[in-house]
């Protein structure tokens, strides 16, 4: 028996996450990952990623998915849904079969990149090749990469349909179809495209649908396309137990002052601030920068490469504050985020649920603060009723134990997400470099010196603007907490505000 488990002693395990967790992830049947009879290479990746025991959604979904049955799963944000479908996907893939065997569809590029990174992390020993394809990127690069071996295709609906229609992506042997954020995927924006994509898959494929909310459109899709699905519902309550929710009643022109007060009093590890429009995202990011805080921003109107850079740097903790639209409300898992602020109160309960779910990930603690004005009061009551939760008035002092981990070093740093196109370009450059070196060695044998291959730097990457010295002095004069004393990035990426958009009239 000891010989069977000897491989565990050779694993490169990360530092254990000692932060307290809630019943959202602890209320399990007591199973372990070994109980699912997964292949050893997959277990190695699971343990090296820091996974210890399966969460409730993983415990329910993994063994059923491995048997090949369709699944319709509903669970809270931040409880391990991604691993719940990635693990059975990796278990079912046959590395020696050079075909696309699994298709994972997600609504945004950021979520696609994150999902692919989970696949690469958990499947690092499995020999599985994963490719990401999304709109807004070079189609030619995708076509070239599909000439190589791809086992798992992760993408957004439009680009996947484009590649399948061109017969570049061969889905004829794709036996597994996964939809994350199924409620969004089956909205009017994507439903027709999803229906078309399914025509390229074999009829006898397995379908896994995961989401936190299931509207009528999902049920209609289930009746039409799923065969006797196993239904999982772990939503006794909609909001995560580890998130404390407050509202602050302020006039519109006082919101920025209130935000500044929160920055000075809260112990923020990382924070996401949501606005309801792209113009307000950019303007608020500029205002926060003017106050002397480091700040990035992201919204759907930005260039794709800029969004990628923001997402990557924020995940790596290079800045504490991110201002964004609802672009990042779905699926984005950054465990260092412990505070979410709704600078603009959302219009629907669904949006509110996804926004505050960016904190308190995987059963940990988080804080959600809503800045509301007179026009938001009825919406606040409506969302409380729909979600069955209470949003209390913000107290004068917020207990740090509600949202701050005792040991900050226990917060796991995510594995860097590399843009697949940059990875492909780097691989091609390395191949060219090797070819040139080989030619150079042959040339030296023939009597002329070989030339060293030169790899040019990546072009078009957004740069930070210089930091004015007065902002650093302002930090010290205002007595800001140590965690906020850092050089601010000037409204990342540097762009001009819309013409005629006067800040004083809004705040």
From Swiss-Prot:
Encoding gene (name): DHH1
Low complexity composition-biased segments: 430-452, 466-488
Chain positions of motif Q motif: 31-59
Role according to the record: ATP-dependent RNA helicase involved in mRNA turnover, and more specifically in mRNA decapping. Is involved in G1/S DNA-damage checkpoint recovery, probably through the regulation of the translational status of a subset of mRNAs. May also have a role in translation and mRNA nuclear export.
Biological process terms in GO annotation: cellular response to glucose starvation; cellular response to nitrogen starvation; deadenylation-dependent decapping of nuclear-transcribed mRNA; invasive filamentous growth; mRNA processing; mRNA transport; negative regulation of translational elongation; P-body assembly
Gene3D superfamilies to which the protein is assigned, alphabetical: P-loop containing nucleotide triphosphate hydrolases (3.40.50.300)
Motif segment (DEAD box): 180-183
Subcellular location: Cytoplasm, P-body
Binding site for ATP: 75-82
SMART domains for the chain: DEXDc, HELICc
All residue ranges annotated as the Helicase ATP-binding domain in the record: 62-232
Catalytic activity: ATP + H2O = ADP + phosphate + H(+)
A GO term from the CC aspect: P-body
Classification via PROSITE patterns: DEAD_ATP_HELICASE, HELICASE_ATP_BIND_1, HELICASE_CTER, Q_MOTIF
Keyword entries, A-Z: ATP-binding, Cytoplasm, Helicase, Hydrolase, mRNA processing, mRNA transport, Nucleotide-binding, RNA-binding, Translation regulation, Transport
Region (Disordered): 1-26, 425-507
Name recorded for this polypeptide: ATP-dependent RNA helicase DHH1
Keyword Transport in annotation: yes
Domain notes: The Q motif is unique to and characteristic of the DEAD box family of RNA helicases and controls ATP binding and hydrolysis.
Span of domain Helicase C-terminal: 242-402
Cysteine disulfide links: none
GO molecular function: ATP binding; ATP hydrolysis activity; chromatin binding; mRNA binding; RNA helicase activity
């Amino acid at each position: 028996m000891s010989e069977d488990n000897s491989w565990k002693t050779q694993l490169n395990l990360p530092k254990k996450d000692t932060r307290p967790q809630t019943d959202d992830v602890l209320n399990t049947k007591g199973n372990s990952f070994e109980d699912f009879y997964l292949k050893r290479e997959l277990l190695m990746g699971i343990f090296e990623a820091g996974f210890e025991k399966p969460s409730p959604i993983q415990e329910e979904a993994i063994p059923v998915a491995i048997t090949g049955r369709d699944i319709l799963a509903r669970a809270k944000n931040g409880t391990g849904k991604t691993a719940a479908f990635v693990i059975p996907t990796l278990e079912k893939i046959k590395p020696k079969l050079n075909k696309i065997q699994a298709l994972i569809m997600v609504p945004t590029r950021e979520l696609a990149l994150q999902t692919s990174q989970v696949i690469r992390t958990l499947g690092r020993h499995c020999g599985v090749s994963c490719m990401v394809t999304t709109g807004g990127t070079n189609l030619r690069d995708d076509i070239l990469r599909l000439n190589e071996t791809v086992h798992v295709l992760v993408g957004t609906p439009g680009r996947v349909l484009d590649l399948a229609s061109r017969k570049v992506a061969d889905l004829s042997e794709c036996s597994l179809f996964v939809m994350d954020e199924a409620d969004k995927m089956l909205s009017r924006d994507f439903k027709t495209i999803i229906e078309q994509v399914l025509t390229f898959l074999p009829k006898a494929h397995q379908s896994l649908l995961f989401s936190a909310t299931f509207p009528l459109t999902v049920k209609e899709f289930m009746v039409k396309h799923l065969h006797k699905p196993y239904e999982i519902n772990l939503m006794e309550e909609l909001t995560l137990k580890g998130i404390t929710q407050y509202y602050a009643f302020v006039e519109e022109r006082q919101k920025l002052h209130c935000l500044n007060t929160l920055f000075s009093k809260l112990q923020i590890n990382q924070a996401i601030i949501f606005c309801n429009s792209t113009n307000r995202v950019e303007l608020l990011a500029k205002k926060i920068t003017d106050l002397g805080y480091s700040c990035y921003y992201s919204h759907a109107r930005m260039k794709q490469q800029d969004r990628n850079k923001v997402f990557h740097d924020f995940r790596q903790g290079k800045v504490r504050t991110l201002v964004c639209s609802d672009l990042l409300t779905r699926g984005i898992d950054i465990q260092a985020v412990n505070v979410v602020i709704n600078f603009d109160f959302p219009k629907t309960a669904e949006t509110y649920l996804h926004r505050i779910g960016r904190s308190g990930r995987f059963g940990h603690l988080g804080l959600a603060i809503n800045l509301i004005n007179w026009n938001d009061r009825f919406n606040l009551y409506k969302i409380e009723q729909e979600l069955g939760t209470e949003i209390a008035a913000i107290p004068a002092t917020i207990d740090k134990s509600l949202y701050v981990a005792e040991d900050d070093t226990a917060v796991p740093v995510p594995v860097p997400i590399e843009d697949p196109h940059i990875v492909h370009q780097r691989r091609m450059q390395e191949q060219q470099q090797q070819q040139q070196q080989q030619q150079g060695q042959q040339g030296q044998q023939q009597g002329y010196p070989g030339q060293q291959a030169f790899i040019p730097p990546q072009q078009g990457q957004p740069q930070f603007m210089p930091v004015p010295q007065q902002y650093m002095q302002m930090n010290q004069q205002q007595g800001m907490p140590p965690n906020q004393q850092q050089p601010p990035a000037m409204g990342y990426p540097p762009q001009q505000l819309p013409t005629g958009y006067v800040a004083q009239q809004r705040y």
